């Protein structure tokens, strides 16, 4: 059977998403979408068996990114699998905001700390686009740091170092010009309401932000001033409806709220804080 015929069969038989069917076929055949449509290769019986297995996994709601083993984030390839959070397009907004303030950050210093680094996507995207920075990505999950380290090698990015650790523990005080984080921010009692792809497959420790979803914001903001240089910045991804609560934590800790940036859906998504010179 030809590849395009196989895609039509999958879509019709399982009411399958056509884009996902294309990605699975391309993954198994080791071709891109242009080759898929220009060459329309024949599928061998062995490839058909592999495709069937991957389709069955997706029908069980396993995320496509885990099935294929990779995704793209800010134009870099990121390897992912069970035990590491899948990068979201919304998180690219945080990277954009850091890069827009590249000169401002450089005026303070050249070290950036990426907390809860996971796959390393934020640290690597910044590192690739701003080679003058030295970036440290930290996560308490050894599996996540293993993926992050592999992604560093995959993309040949030299100015990023990944470490296993709990928040700020490995670092000396007052050395960072900027802190970035996409921390766990889902309320504990809301995890059961998430899509099955998320709650049944992605690591809960990368999602669970505690009873009110704010545990990690408190840990980050309340400790950040000890590690930031004067006028240093914090870039935080936040969940829907959390802006006011996170802003209050920031103000109580002596940080100025510089901006809250919305995502494409109009939801507050990234909060930018600055360390007061008086801290």
UniProtKB/Swiss-Prot annotation:
- Determine the domain of life of the protein's source: Bacteria
- Give the catalysed reaction(s), semicolon-separated: L-glutaminyl-[peptide chain release factor] + S-adenosyl-L-methionine = N(5)-methyl-L-glutaminyl-[peptide chain release factor] + S-adenosyl-L-homocysteine + H(+)
Annotated substrate binding sites = 182-185
Q: Which UniProt keywords apply?
A: Methyltransferase, S-adenosyl-L-methionine, Transferase
For whether the record's keyword set contains DNA-binding, the answer is no
Annotated GO biological processes are: methylation; translational termination
Q: Name one Pfam family in it.
A: PrmC_N
What EC number is given for this enzyme? 2.1.1.297
Cleaved signal peptide residues: none
Annotated GO molecular function terms are: protein-(glutamine-N5) methyltransferase activity; protein-glutamine N-methyltransferase activity
Q: Which residues bind S-adenosyl-L-methionine?
A: 139, 182
Which InterPro entries does UniProt cross-reference here? HemK-like, N5-glutamine_MTase, PrmC_N, RF_methyltr_PrmC, SAM-dependent_MTases_sf, Small_mtfrase_dom
Q: Which NCBIfam families does this one have?
A: hemK_fam, RF_mod_PrmC
Q: Which family does it belong to?
A: Belongs to the protein N5-glutamine methyltransferase family. PrmC subfamily.
Known role: Methylates the class 1 translation termination release factors RF1/PrfA and RF2/PrfB on the glutamine residue of the universally conserved GGQ motif.
Q: What HAMAP family does UniProt report for this protein, alphabetically?
A: RF_methyltr_PrmC
Q: This protein is called what?
A: Release factor glutamine methyltransferase
Natural source organism: Thermodesulfovibrio yellowstonii (strain ATCC 51303 / DSM 11347 / YP87)
Write the lineage as a comma-separated list. Answer: Bacteria, Pseudomonadati, Nitrospirota, Thermodesulfovibrionia, Thermodesulfovibrionales
């Amino acid at each position: 059977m030809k590849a395009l015929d196989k895609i039509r069969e999958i879509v019709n038989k399982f009411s399958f998403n056509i884009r996902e069917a294309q990605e699975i076929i391309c993954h198994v055949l080791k071709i891109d979408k242009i080759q898929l449509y220009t060459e329309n290769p024949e599928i061998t019986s062995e490839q058909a068996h592999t495709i069937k297995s991957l389709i069955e996994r997706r029908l069980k709601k396993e995320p496509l990114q885990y099935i294929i083993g990779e995704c793209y984030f800010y134009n870099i390839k990121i390897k992912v699998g069970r035990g590491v959070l899948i990068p979201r397009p919304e998180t690219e907004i945080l990277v954009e905001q850091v890069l827009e303030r590249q000169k401002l950050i450089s005026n303070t210093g050249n070290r950036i700390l990426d907390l809860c680094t996971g796959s390393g996507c934020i640290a690597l995207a910044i590192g690739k686009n701003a080679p003058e920075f030295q970036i440290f990505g930290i996560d308490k999950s050894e599996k996540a740091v293993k993926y992050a380290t592999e992604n560093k090698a995959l993309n040949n990015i030299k100015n990023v170092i990944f470490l296993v650790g709990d928040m700020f523990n490995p670092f000396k005080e007052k050395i960072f010009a900027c802190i970035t984080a996409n921390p766990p921010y889902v309320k504990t009692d809301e995890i059961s309401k998430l899509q099955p792809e998320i709650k049944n497959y992605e690591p809960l420790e990368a999602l669970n932000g505690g009873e009110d979803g704010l545990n990690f914001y408190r840990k980050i903001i309340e400790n950040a001033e000890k590690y930031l240089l004067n006028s240093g910045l914090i870039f935080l991804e936040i969940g829907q409806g959390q802006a006011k609560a996170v802003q209050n934590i920031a103000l109580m800790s002596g940080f100025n709220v510089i901006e809250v940036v919305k995502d494409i859906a109009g939801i507050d998504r990234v909060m930018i804080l600055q360390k007061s010179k008086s801290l």
